[in-house]
Amino acid sequence: MQMADLEKKLENSVLPPLLKRELSEKILKEEISEEYLVDEIISETIRAYERTLVEPGEAVGVVAAQSIGEPGTQMTMRTFHYAGVAELNVTLGLPRMIEIVDARKEPSTPTMTIYLNDDFKGDREKASMVAKNIESTNVESVSEDISVDLINECITIVLNTHQLESRGLTVADVIESIKSKMKLKIEDHENVLNLKIKTPSLKALRKRLPKVRAIHLKGVQNIKRVIIRKEVDEYILYSEGSNIKEVFDIEGVDTTKTTTNNIVEIQDVLGIEAARNAIIYEMDATLGNQGLTVDKRHLMMVADLMCTDGVVKPIGRHGIGGEKASVLARAAFEETVKHLYSASMRGYVDELGGVVENIIVGKPIAMGTGCIDVCIDKTYEEGKEL
């Protein structure tokens, strides 16, 4: 049996293109040559596919909401340590689920899972080098003490040589970075730097102190810490903080697998389709972490709804809930008086096309048998049975 023969058999079937291709590849891989067996496999696949289809008029939104919401009541409310990674806090459970559906611009604990290229992933030293290049280093993180010297009227930085060496920096690098960010006169006394300004005063020195501490020396902005962990036969990096755009530019990073839990950042860097996949993955992982299983199609429906306009929108009054076409549906969700008052002022007419608004006015909803109109042929003969 050749691929062309299988394609011909599946050409007019109801199966989607991806399923057709996967089925063909599976039949060829198993080397099934008997035509009656191939026909039986195709028929059974079509029957199984048709059983999974949603019935016309099914309330898929309500079913999805119930299927996700009911297990959600069993979820924990706390922030946990990420399994197997020491000292790295990650928000899990219900708070994480709320973050996802609210499309928060910044998660409470942004993290990245950074995979390495083939040349780096098996070598601990190379993985450590990539981690050092990613981890953000500022003046404070390589200093033993940063304080205002009232006698000499300057800011004194006592550098930690061990920290400098471990992060691949020198005193000259620190001086150069400070000079590029601030107009200061720097006196170098081995590992002690004195920073002086033109018109010194206690107020002026104290004002500059936080800025000096925060001067960026090396690494990726917003990545506070990177942890290396060996999983099976490769090293994987876990970061505290997220900046996927800059991390992708670091040598040794596998851009095809590296990801972040910041969905809005994924949308900005990789696009809306990647953000949709991230929403599905994050919801599934959050539920799975609690030992809960929800059919992925319910999660896909939520993700599709959030991403349908090309940008990630929250499910709530500031997003999808507040953009419903029906005035009554918007009023029933939240901010009732605001929506009714605004609609009255503008003379809006509610077409009663949805579910909520029909329930409010006591009409049958367009769902299940309610979405079917029975049509009678008026030309039938009188007395003849239909």
From Swiss-Prot:
Task: State its Enzyme Commission number(s).
Answer: 2.7.7.6
Q: Name where it mostly resides.
A: cytoplasm
Give the subcellular location. Answer: Cytoplasm
Q: Does the keyword DNA-binding apply?
A: yes
User: One GO BP annotation here?
Assistant: DNA-templated transcription
GO CC annotation terms, alphabetical? cytoplasm; DNA-directed RNA polymerase complex
Q: Which reaction does it catalyse?
A: RNA(n) + a ribonucleoside 5'-triphosphate = RNA(n+1) + diphosphate
Matching HAMAP family: RNApol_arch_Rpo1C
Q: What function is annotated for this protein?
A: DNA-dependent RNA polymerase (RNAP) catalyzes the transcription of DNA into RNA using the four ribonucleoside triphosphates as substrates. Forms part of the jaw domain.
Instruction: State the similarity comment.
Output: Belongs to the RNA polymerase beta' chain family.
* Name of the protein in question: DNA-directed RNA polymerase subunit Rpo1C
| Gene expressing this chain | rpo1C
